[in-house]
Amino acid sequence: MVAAGTTVVSANTVTAAAQAPVNLRSAGTFAILSQSGVTDVYASAIKGDVGASPITGAAIGLACSEVTGTIFAVDAAGPPCAVTAPTILTTAVGDVGAAYLDAEGRTFPNFVDLDAGEIGGLTLAPGLYKWNTDVNISTDVTLSGGPTDVWIFQIAGTLDQAAAKNVTLAGGAQAKNVFWQSAGAVTLGTTAHFEGTILSKTMIAMKTGASTNGRLLAQTAVTLQMNTVTLPAL
């Protein structure tokens, strides 16, 4: 058990090697990719591509003015600026599935069930973290490492971030190297800030005013409420 609030968690280099980033392939250009649609309370600001497949483009509830990037739809029922590109979307959705399995399948974790899933208040070093439980971020959490270091979080349950709490990066850590694989739903609380790519087996919900420097890659729905989602520097 690691006490929350003051602890710096260091990776166990004896039992696990440094992790390679999860390969997102064609999904890497998407700030948001969903299989069953995107709902939105206006106005959100999305910097990066947006797509939904196999569901109709009518399920993409974003205005063109909210997206700096390309909106891809499987048919002409999407927003008026959307590009109809079912083949691109089929490939990207398949790549999300492969990335999810890659993250889920990494072995020899540095930490298992750290703090029973309550990581608020911790500073986490690079490495592979595995939980057989839900994970909660009830207070700010920091990921501290260098620009090439990688964090992969394997979560068997849900991931919940409390309102007005932050995931922050320190020491040169980069959002492009942070991956959260969650078998359950992911909820980012009101005005919370999050870092990294979320690979969710189900849905991702951002509450009012929450922001993400990363990607929302959901195998069901994505719900937005006046949010900011920024694709990380590649």
Q: What is the predicted role of each segment?
A:
Residues M1-T13:
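Secretory targeting and sorting signals
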Residues N12-L234:
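Solvent-exposed adhesion/ligand-recognition segments of exported proteins
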